[in-house]
């Protein structure tokens, strides 16, 4: 083993945060220094040349001052016996760089801890707990001890459970020790069946059975028979859900039987490379819509980052594994937790009710979990466009008496939508003899028993089993697998996949039997053919672990050659682990021990286990009305704006890429001031169409404490009032996912669940014409623990989260909450605000945000009293949206009318005057009730026609003209002549932002968080704006395109790159012939660059950014003789041009020694905020010789920014001056007044002199961090000025490239 020192691992503010944590625990630590340590496992000694190459490879990241460390060494490394994603990717790079001597690389972090006194053993343990994740890491106290990382242990054998001698008792003991969560009748079932077989079960068989038959996988409660209040019920819960499909099957292509549901989409030109020529082209066909929403609550409670990350990853796999290959497209995440209690910002309603030690508190869940979910989506390359966040934790009198209700077991929702070809919606038959394949990463000893563990109440299982059930993520691996699936479905009728499932709960022990069973086959498997990174694992651990990023497939023998070629090109590992058999029998052979750990008929594993029967009793709640004493409207407004459910969510949004794909038509951020208040998420179906897809969410979970049915109806209603803001048309085009969370078995909750399912499945959805073709249930939403001998519990309310999906006719019609004034819309004229109140003046306050911030529950909650009226509302809004009658639209939800109008004013940067006299005499109830409805802004010229449309749909009595919009800072509610509330809009905007600021300051660089917060106090901020030196609607490439010649453009990608398709689309539109080129094509000689005139290196996360962003990719070129020669020759050909964007920018900057005129280029390193930044940032084109920016100097326009490592790093001031003097700076960040800026977030990464793009001395090669290819269409811009046509301003760059060739 060779040890190589790396660069410092922690910036100054990260060290300070760690020291602060030490102080909080009274640890006498005075200083901490950390640096990376690299360990190389070698086949033989390195010669000098190889050592120099390896040292260069392992020099990466920002330059932080090094010093000779002192103090106690604590070396954090991956757990011995495991291979980290960092290790596998960096080893790949080393091998691609020709370092064949390297068997494996691994990385640790050496912490040197200085203290005022010698630390005791307990204190050292406390420091260790702060610096490592015990699930995946270990701590050594000397560097040499890291050799344990490379020791290979002996495999453990299979174990038996002796039921033939020990009977039922033996299985009961195994049930506890293995954490199987088997029910009594399942234990009887297993004893009976194995006794019949005349043999003892192996532990692996029992674990496999437990996973396959867990509540998590089998949904026993939803399939159970029910008796309520002594009366047998006709239908199971699942039957009532299916009733929605039986009533309204319209537009549903697949429901209840696959990994995701499918509905009909639009006929569009899907843009992807021709499988033979690899040239990108449009394929005119149906792009059907697939949809799925998952929960990952249990793992997120135990370990938030990986819990949320693998939640998103699993849901993405569900989409990819739909039919015989789908394409994930856009994502959503949602969180419900107990109160945050932010240190120093605790709120009056936040009481501390305690928690068990094994789960994480709500604050840490929300500091870490969202980062995990965002990081997976970012690295995979899926925009995250939607979400919600609710906090609830209170002692209330509910139907079960006085108790604490809250979310110590959080809800973590991960969902999304994608597209699928018509011929791929249904799975095919699995032929006998088909290869049964595991595609993706290796088996690791993590995530054991996740299905069974998540089916128990938090705190019931042993702590080590809880931790064992958490998984770890490697999104770049999943991206590679998805690229394989993409290449397969792009073959159309020749798609080699016959059957596919994702690997989720229960690992391959669930996925492979399910694959065989669904394909009506058996399977014969070889245990030692399963790719395995921990050789010491027992058969149970290999077969049942939940290692992520894996799919199981069936491929006919005659298609294996094509499948193998695709996997090699995409560098996606796979293994044939078995063969499909005619007989429905499952066999698993182990060549190492020469035995058969599994040998059982399929019908014992997945057969008719006993059906559950639930007995339930209805309990009614008697809760008093809200006590008004001491509630002042002004203070109520402030409190409600600080409630996390209502407060600004920027800290949850800018961490997630919202522009990747170039197909995003509506993200969360709205208008020139980029305020996060969008009603719904919208994507375009392709680059040649305005058809698209939309997603929205609805949930009102605290209402279930008063009325189960109302809570469920409101969730459906809110999803509709949100999605009504876009152009859907017929309500039957909308399909819902229903995610049900319940503390099953808690007094009154089972009957309540039945009531809620009936309310939507049998009543509301059929009345509206809505279908629920997909969903999930999580039936153990309770946390129990002991504290000082007292048993405690926190029980969640019944929680239904609805996600609505719909096909969009025209994405341009989407209306946002941004109020318009003549400042933002020329020639606007007078406008009015109209409230449509679906509560019909009832103004009920039960379980509202207002009630919560005063520690109350109230009596009657809002409800959907009239389904016909709700449908009329949707139809009316669709008419008005389609006919361009609405300037602004915002649904009424948490926080009521007050919050609806406040958010509209924040987005419009304007004032509001509203008179609420005709809405009721109780001003508090009028302002803060959460009845369904919406506020719209309309031109006074259109007011009569809008009101008559509302009346024609039965809404006349509940439609009220309530006020006007003003270009001012005044936010005023009156009731006749009486002023009810008069505030500064800016002041309210700042209060609304406090929560996001506090969370950002705790999690990211606090200096950046403070700058962003300060900027929100500036009422004079003009917002995003555009100033162009050219005509955006002129196509300067048109004359060259007309000639018919198409110059050849290499669209270059490496493993982990995810922005290549939109880049190809932009160059294709500009008249180029765009060709898909993977780095593996170059390294294997399948592609040569001398055939191309242009080359573009695309954005993403090459090699997961393990050796610095873009650095691994660059080094695999620099240190590979053949690749180096090709690239050098290309850059030296004078007729060529090149572009590097984001990851491609980072990569080309590291190739500068090969690029003429690039010698001054800087490096790009970690953002100053130390966070991935997804922003819509204003930039100005500088005067330079770049062929891309010809005629654009002085132009100022916004652009998509999405990166974690975009900060320009120069050697010193002299280097920076030389760059400026050379005239090669091509782009700078500017503020909204047009000045180059260092202020965050206008300068999202802290680059000196606001530099974000450079070119070479002759202008042939340009690099830039922002993404022009994602916003080349006007509809793909988060905000664009009126008057832009189909092409956005950034399309000019690509047209310039075409014009330059002539």
From Swiss-Prot:
Keywords: ATP-binding, Cytoplasm, Glutamine amidotransferase, Ligase, Magnesium, Metal-binding, Nucleotide-binding, Purine biosynthesis. ATP binds at residues 307-318, 678. Pathway: Purine metabolism; IMP biosynthesis via de novo pathway; 5-amino-1-(5-phospho-D-ribosyl)imidazole from N(2)-formyl-N(1)-(5-phospho-D-ribosyl)glycinamide: step 1/2. GO terms for molecular function: ATP binding; metal ion binding; phosphoribosylformylglycinamidine synthase activity. One of its GO terms (biological process) is 'de novo' IMP biosynthetic process. It is found in: Cytoplasm. Mg(2+) binds at residues 718, 722, 891. CDD domains: GATase1_FGAR_AT (cd01740), PurL_repeat1 (cd02203). Residues 1049-1302 form the Glutamine amidotransferase type-1 domain. The active site is at 1142 (nucleophile), 1267, 1269. It is an enzyme of class 6 (ligase). HAMAP family: PurL_1 (MF_00419). This is Phosphoribosylformylglycinamidine synthase. The lineage of its organism: Bacteria, Pseudomonadati, Pseudomonadota, Gammaproteobacteria, Vibrionales. The gene is purL.
């Amino acid at each position: 083993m060779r040890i190589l020192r790396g660069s410092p691992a922690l910036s100054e503010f990260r060290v300070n945060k760690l020291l602060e944590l030490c102080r909080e625990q009274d640890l006498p630590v005075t200083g901490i220094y950390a640096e990376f340590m690299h360990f190389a496992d070698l086949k033989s000694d390195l010669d000098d040349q190889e050592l120099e190459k390896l040292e260069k490879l392992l020099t990466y990241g920002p330059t932080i001052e090094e010093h000779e460390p002192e103090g106690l060494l604590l070396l954090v490394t991956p757990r011995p016996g495991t291979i980290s994603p960092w290790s596998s990717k960096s080893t790949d790079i080393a091998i691609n760089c020709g370092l064949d001597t390297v068997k494996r690389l691994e990385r640790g972090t050496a912490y040197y801890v200085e203290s005022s006194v010698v630390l005791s053993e307990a204190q050292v343990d406390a420091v260790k707990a702060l610096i490592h994740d015990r699930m995946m890491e270990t701590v050594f106290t000397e560097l040499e001890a890291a050799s344990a990382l490379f020791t290979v242990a002996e495999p453990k054998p299979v174990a038996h459970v002796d039921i033939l001698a020990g009977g039922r008792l033996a299985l009961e003991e195994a049930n506890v020790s293995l954490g199987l969560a088997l029910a009594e009748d399942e234990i009887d079932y297993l004893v009976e069946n194995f006794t019949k077989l005349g043999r003892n079960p192996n532990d692996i068989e029992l674990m496999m059975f437990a996973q396959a038959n867990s509540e998590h996988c089998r949904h026993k409660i939803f399939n159970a028979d029910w008796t309520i209040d002594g009366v047998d019920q006709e239908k199971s819960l699942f039957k009532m859900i299916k009733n929605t499909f039986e009533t309204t099957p319209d537009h549903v292509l697949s429901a209840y039987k696959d990994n995701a549901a499918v509905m009909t989409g639009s006929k569009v030109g899907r843009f992807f490379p021709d499988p033979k020529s690899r040239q990108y082209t449009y394929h005119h066909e149906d792009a059907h819509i697939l949809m799925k929403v998952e929960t990952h609550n249990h793992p997120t409670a135990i370990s938030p980052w990986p819990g949320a990350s693998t939640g998103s990853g699993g849901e993405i796999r569900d989409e990819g594994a739909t039919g015989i290959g789908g394409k994930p497209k856009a994502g959503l995440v949602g969180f419900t937790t107990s109160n945050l209690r932010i240190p120093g910002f605790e709120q009056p309603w936040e009481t501390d009710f305690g928690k068990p030690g094994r789960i994480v508190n709500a604050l840490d869940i929300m500091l870490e979990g969202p980062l995990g979910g965002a990081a997976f989506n970012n690295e995979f390359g899926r925009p995250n466009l939607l979400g919600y966040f609710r906090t609830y934790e209170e002692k209330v009198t509910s139907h079960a008496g006085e108790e604490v209700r809250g979310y110590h077991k959080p809800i973590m929702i991960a969902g999304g939508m994608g597209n699928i070809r018509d011929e791929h919606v249904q799975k095919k038959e699995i032929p006998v003899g088909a290869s049964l394949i595991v595609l993706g990463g290796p088996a690791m000893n993590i995530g054991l028993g996740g299905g069974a563990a998540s089916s128990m109440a938090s705190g019931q299982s042993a702590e080590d089993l809880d931790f064992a059930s958490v998984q770890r993520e490697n999104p770049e691996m999943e991206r590679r697998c998805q690229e394989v699936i993409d290449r397969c479905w792009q073959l159309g009728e020749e798609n080699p996949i016959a059957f596919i499932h994702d690997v989720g709960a229960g690992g391959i022990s669930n996925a492979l039997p399910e694959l065989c069973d669904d394909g009506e086959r058996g399977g014969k498997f070889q245990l030692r053919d399963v790719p395995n990174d921990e050789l010491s694992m027992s058969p149970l651990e290999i077969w049942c672990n939940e290692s992520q990023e894996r799919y199981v497939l069936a491929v006919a023998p005659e298609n294996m050659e094509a499948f193998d070629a695709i996997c090699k090109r995409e560098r996606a590992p796979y293994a044939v682990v078995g063969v499909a058999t005619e007989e429905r029998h499952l066999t698993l052979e182990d060549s190492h021990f020469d035995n058969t750990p599994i040998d059982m008929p399929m019908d014992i594993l997945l057969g008719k286990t006993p059906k559950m029967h639930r007995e339930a009793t209805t309990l009614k709640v008697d809760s008093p009305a809200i006590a008004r004493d001491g509630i002042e409207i002004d203070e109520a407004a402030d409190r409600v704006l600080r409630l996390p459910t209502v407060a600004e969510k920027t800290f949850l949004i800018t961490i997630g890429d919202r522009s990747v794909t170039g197909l995003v038509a509506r993200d969360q951020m709205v208008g020139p001031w980029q305020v996060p208040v969008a009603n719904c998420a919208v994507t375009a179906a392709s680059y040649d169409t305005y058809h698209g897809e939309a997603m929205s969410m609805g949930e009102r979970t605290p209402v279930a404490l008063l009325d189960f049915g109302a809570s469920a109806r409101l969730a459906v209603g809110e999803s509709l009032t949100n999605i009504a803001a876009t152009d859907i048309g017929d309500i039957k085009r909308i399909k819902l996912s229903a995610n049900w969370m319940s503390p099953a078995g808690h007094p009154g909750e089972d009957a309540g669940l039945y009531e809620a399912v009936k309310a939507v499945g049998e009543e509301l959805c059929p009345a509206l014409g809505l279908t629920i073709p997909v969903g999930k249930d999580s039936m153990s939403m309770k946390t129990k623990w002991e504290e000082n001998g007292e048993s405690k519990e926190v029980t969640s309310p019944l929680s239904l989260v609805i996600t609505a999906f719909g096909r969009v006719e025209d994405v341009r019609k989407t209306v946002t909450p941004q109020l318009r004034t003549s400042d933002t819309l020329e020639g606007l004229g007078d406008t009015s605000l109209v409230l449509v109140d679906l509560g019909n003046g009832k103004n009920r306050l039960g379980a509202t945000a207002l009630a919560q911030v005063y520690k109350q529950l109230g009596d009657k909650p809002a409800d959907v009293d009239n389904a016909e009226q709700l449908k009329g509302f949707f139809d009316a809004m669709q008419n008005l949206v389609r006919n361009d009658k609405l300037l602004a639209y915002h649904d009424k939800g948490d926080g009521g009318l007050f919050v609806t109008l406040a958010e509209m004013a924040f987005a419009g940067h304007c004032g509001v005057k509203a008179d609420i006299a005709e809405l009721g005499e109780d001003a508090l109830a009028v302002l803060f009730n959460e009845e369904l409805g919406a506020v719209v802004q309309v031109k006074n010229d259109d007011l009569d026609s809008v009101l008559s449309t509302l009346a024609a749909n039965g809404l006349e009595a509940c439609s009220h003209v309530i006020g006007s919009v003003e270009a001012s800072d005044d936010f005023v509610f009156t009731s006749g002549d009486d002023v009810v509330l008069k505030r500064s809009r800016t002041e309210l905007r700042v209060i609304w932002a406090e929560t996001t600021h506090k969370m950002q300051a705790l999690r990211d660089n606090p200096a950046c968080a403070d700058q962003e917060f300060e900027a929100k106090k500036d009422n004079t901020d003009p917002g995003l704006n555009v100033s162009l030196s050219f005509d955006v609607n002129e196509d300067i490439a048109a004359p060259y395109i007309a000639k018919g010649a198409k110059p050849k453009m290499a669209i270059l990608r490496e493993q982990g790159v995810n922005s290549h398709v939109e880049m190809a689309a932009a160059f294709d539109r500009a008249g180029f012939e765009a060709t898909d080129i993977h780095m593996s094509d170059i390294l294997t000689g399948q592609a040569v660059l001398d055939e191309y005139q242009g080359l573009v290196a695309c954005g993403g996360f090459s090699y997961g950014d393990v050796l610095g962003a873009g650095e691994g990719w660059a080094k695999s070129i620099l240190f590979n003789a053949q690749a180096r020669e090709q690239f050098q020759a290309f850059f030296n050909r004078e007729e060529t041009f090149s572009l590097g964007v984001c990851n491609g920018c980072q990569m080309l900057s590291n190739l500068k020694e090969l690029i003429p005129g690039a010698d001054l280029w800087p490096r790009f390193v970690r953002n100053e905020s130390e966070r991935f930044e997804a922003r819509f940032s204003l930039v100005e084109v500088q005067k330079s010789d770049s062929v891309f920016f010809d005629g654009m100097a002085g132009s100022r326009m916004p652009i998509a920014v999405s990166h974690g490592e975009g900060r320009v790093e120069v050697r010193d001031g002299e280097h920076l001056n030389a760059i400026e003097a050379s005239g090669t700076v091509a782009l700078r960040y500017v503020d909204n007044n047009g000045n180059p800026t260092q202020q965050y977030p206008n300068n999202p990464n802290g680059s000196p002199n606001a530099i974000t793009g450079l070119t070479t001395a002759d202008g042939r090669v340009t690099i830039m961090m922002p993404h022009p290819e994602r916003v080349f269409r006007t509809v793909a811009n988060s905000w664009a000025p009126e008057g832009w046509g189909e092409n956005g301003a950034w399309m000019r760059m690509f047209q310039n490239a075409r014009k330059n060739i002539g």
